Amino acid sequence: MEKAHRPTHSKAIVFVLVAVVSGTLMDTLLKVAGAHVGTWQLLVLRWSFALLVLLPVILTGSAGSMHIQSWRVHIARGLLNCLGSYALFYALATLPLSVVITILFAEPLFVIPFAVLILHEQVGTKDVLAALLGLVGVVVMSQPDVSQGDWKMLLPLVAASSFALLNVLTKKWGAQESPVSLMLWMAVSTLLITIPFAASQWVELRWQDYGMALAIAVLGSVYSYFWIVGLRMGNVAKLTQLSFLSLPLAFGLGWAFFHEAPGAVTVWGALIIAAAVMLLSMNMARVKTAHVFLRRLFKPAKS
């Protein structure tokens, strides 16, 4: 059994690593594109190309059923995705890459209160401490700017909390649909919401902008698929710790491409948030099976 388990876990590690790198590269391209493209227009381009990326999988029938269980679920997910994505895209265009990704990294910590309120799940003292510690890290990173009236530092916080709530709602109501179906209707609902806003301020784009939007969509789809499948194959409590690689990767990309040298406050905030997520992961490793953590955060559950 253990020999059979090792190749699967090794494959899971590769999948999660691919997801982490793809997600960080996607955020980097979003920052580049945000300098030339408006946020609403970029949202439309990102999800239009995401829809095109999914179409071959859907048309071949390899993605399973596209049956919709509840339109309310997809509308709610679309609204949350619009809110989170808009906040993320605007934050990436106006804030240092390392700051945005570090605060967004605290997303699992925001799942805890939503899981209690919506799923009525019980959480331990260490879970609460991890969430509070992560909040301290966010405050440390954002306090200097917010105290000076720069509220843009709150945008990554809005994005992280929106995506956390989206994950919890997916767990509560999305079990009877395939992952590709959830991705498809997410793209459709997001486009229906964003197109009217983008149409009023649409500007002519360069071919490079369209190419960048396509690359962003591909990287986003790769991230979503490899992250979900990787976590389902392996020990989630261990695999999620690989996501820490996104922090040094974001710091390195920010320094190399945007000449962003992180200050002491940013580094301290990043360390505190990383410690909080590590505490949460270590606590989850002590439960009877890591799949409890998987079901709590990532795998949709039957309503």
Question: Which residues make up each language-model segment?
Answer:
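Transmembrane alpha-helices of multi-pass small-molecule transport proteins
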Residues: 11-15, 36-83, 162-166, 185-200
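Membrane-interface helix-cap regions at the ends of transmembrane helices
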Residues: 2-3, 51-69, 136-148, 190-209, ...
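C-terminal-most transmembrane helix of multi-pass membrane proteins
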Residues: 2, 248-303
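Transmembrane alpha-helical segments that form core, pore/gating elements
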Residues: 28-31, 39-40, 54, 145-205, ...
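Loop-to-transmembrane-helix transition segments
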Residues: 11-18, 58-59, 63-87, 151-159, ...
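Loop-to-transmembrane alpha-helix entry segments
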Residues: 101-104, 120-140, 146, 150-153, ...
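Alpha-helical transmembrane segments of compact multi-pass small-molecule transporters, enriched
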Residues: 49-53, 103-117, 132-133, 189-193, ...
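Helix-helix packing/entry segments at the starts of transmembrane helices
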Residues: 100-106, 173-188, 224-256
